[in-house]
């Protein structure tokens, strides 16, 4: 028994070497670094296709494909039928006893609608007859020789618009837009507004129409002898309700907008050659000759002058030039001469139509301060114009017909007679009442 127990104890007892190995393995831990990540957590763009190599054409093609809307497919069985609209009126449900009243109300509303439509149609017919009657009257008046009177009635709206424009032009106008070539060639800043300094010393009522101020130039000296020959004639015409008409470009215009246009053009021409404008107007300075003159035909193509002269009417521009020549206090000189032709001017070979503005030239009185470095324009001056040299371009006002004066006197006498007749009747009634 002792031998068996000894063998069992040896089998169950642990071996010391094996225990030491196991304890050493448990104490030693192998630490290895983590592997590098294969994909970025921020989801960056792949480096296989760089952004610089992507063509814009491919992007446009993809955008067009995305923006394409699917086209509807129509089969042969599709049939388009027009819609027949039916008007339905919604209302509250009522009992059978009230249906009769509702039907009666609906019938009354229908009758009212038909009556209103009939009255509107009758009014429309009356208006048509009235317009036809007026048209016949106008035709008859034209045949009898009263075309000017009819033209005045038709041009009331046009004159009101022109008066509004002319009053706006009477105010200091903004920097004018020159011809299209001026827009491309001028490099200066925007021009200042044109301030008219001659309105302070002018008399208010000189017999001219309302809002009309006779031209006295930019530097007025309160001269009453300003050679304005429109004064006496228009003072006589202002007493009559109808303004005389002036014929320009085969059309008749009232006198008031015509005279205001002449004055505005004269002031605008003086502004172009003022120190305020020439300091910034490189285009106009480049067109000056060695004597400081600029062609009037060039100035007439400027934007503001074209608008003020009813589309570039030469009669209005020459009338404004006459006002400048007749004004002793004008800030510009006007001369008569010829423009020397240069080689290469007429490249197309077309003959240029002559204009009455071609022989007139304008310059500032301080022209020596604004001469350009190189002269593009050559002008042969014949003489300077002063006084009444251009009186032939003054627009003549038509005389007032005497029939209007006779009719006005007859109306005044009739009113006096009616007043005299009514006075004793009132006195008799008062005596009978007492």
UniProtKB/Swiss-Prot annotation:
Interacts with HAP1. Component of the HMC including HAP1, SRO9 and YDJ1. It is found in: Cytoplasm. May overlap in function with tropomyosin and may be involved in organization of actin filaments. Acts as a multicopy suppressor of RHO3 mutation. RNA-binding protein which may modulate mRNA translation. Involved in heme regulation of HAP1, as a component of the high-molecular-weight complex (HMC). Present with 8430 molecules/cell in log phase SD medium. There is a cross-link at residues 156, 301, 342, 352 (Glycyl lysine isopeptide (Lys-Gly) (interchain with G-Cter in ubiquitin)). Residues 125-140, 173-195, 228-238 have a biased composition (Basic residues). Residues 26-41, 158-167, 196-208 have a biased composition (Polar residues). GO terms for biological process: negative regulation of DNA-templated transcription; positive regulation of translation; regulation of translation; response to oxygen levels. The modification Phosphoserine is found at residues 55, 148, 422. Residues 1-243, 396-434 are annotated as: Disordered. Keywords: Cytoplasm, Isopeptide bond, Phosphoprotein, RNA-binding, Ubl conjugation. Gene3D superfamilies: Winged helix-like DNA-binding domain superfamily/Winged helix DNA-binding domain. Residues 1-13, 93-124, 218-227 have a biased composition (Low complexity). GO terms for cellular component: cytoplasmic stress granule; cytosol; nucleus; transcription repressor complex. It comes from the Eukaryota. The keyword Ubl conjugation applies. It holds the Pfam family La. Residues 255-351 form the HTH La-type RNA-binding domain. CDD domains: LAM. InterPro entries: La_dom_prot, La_HTH, WH-like_DNA-bd_sf, WH_DNA-bd_sf. One of its GO terms (molecular function) is mRNA binding. This is RNA-binding protein SRO9.
């Amino acid at each position: 028994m002792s031998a068996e127990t000894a063998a069992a104890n040896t089998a169950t007892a642990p071996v010391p070497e094996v225990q030491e190995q196991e304890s050493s393995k448990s104490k030693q831990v192998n630490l290895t670094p983590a592997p590098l990540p294969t994909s970025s957590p921020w989801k960056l763009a792949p480096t296989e296709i760089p952004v610089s190599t992507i063509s814009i054409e491919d992007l446009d093609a993809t955008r067009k494909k995305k923006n394409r809307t699917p086209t509807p497919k129509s089969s042969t069985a599709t049939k388009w039928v027009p819609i027949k609209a039916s008007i339905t009126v919604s209302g509250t449900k009522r009992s059978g006893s009230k249906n009769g009243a509702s039907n009666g109300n609906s019938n009354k509303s229908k009758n009212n609608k038909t009556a209103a439509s009939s009255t509107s149609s009758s009014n429309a017919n009356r208006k048509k007859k009235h317009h036809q009657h007026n048209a016949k009257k106008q035709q008859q008046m034209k045949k009898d020789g009263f075309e000017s009177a009819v033209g005045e009635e038709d041009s009331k709206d046009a004159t009101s618009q022109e008066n509004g424009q002319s009053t706006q032009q009477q105010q200091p106008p903004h920097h004018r837009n020159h011809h299209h070539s001026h827009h491309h060639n001028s490099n200066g800043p925007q021009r200042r507004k044109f301030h008219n300094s001659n309105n302070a010393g002018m008399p208010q009522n000189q017999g001219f129409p309302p809002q009309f101020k006779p031209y006295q130039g930019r530097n007025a000296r309160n001269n009453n002898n300003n050679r304005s020959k429109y004064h006496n004639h228009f003072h006589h015409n202002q007493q009559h309700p109808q303004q005389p008409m002036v014929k320009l470009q085969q059309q008749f215009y009232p006198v008031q907008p015509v005279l205001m246009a002449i004055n505005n053009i004269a002031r605008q021409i003086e502004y172009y050659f003022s120190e305020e404008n020439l300091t910034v107007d490189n285009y106009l300075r480049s067109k000056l000759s060695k004597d400081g003159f600029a062609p009037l035909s060039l100035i007439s193509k400027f934007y503001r002058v074209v608008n003020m002269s009813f589309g570039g009417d030469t009669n209005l521009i020459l009338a404004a030039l006459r006002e400048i020549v007749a004004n002793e206090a004008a800030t510009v000189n006007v001369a008569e001469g010829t423009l020397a032709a240069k080689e290469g001017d007429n490249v197309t070979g077309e003959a240029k139509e002559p204009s009455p503005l071609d022989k007139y030239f304008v310059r500032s009185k301080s022209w020596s301060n604004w001469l350009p470095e190189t002269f593009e324009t050559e002008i042969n001056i014949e003489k300077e114009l002063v006084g009444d040299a251009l009186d032939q371009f003054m627009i003549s006002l038509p005389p007032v017909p005497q029939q209007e004066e006779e009719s006005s006197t007859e109306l005044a006498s009739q009113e006096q007679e009616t007043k005299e007749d009514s006075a004793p009747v009132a006195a008799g009634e008062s005596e009978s009442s007492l």
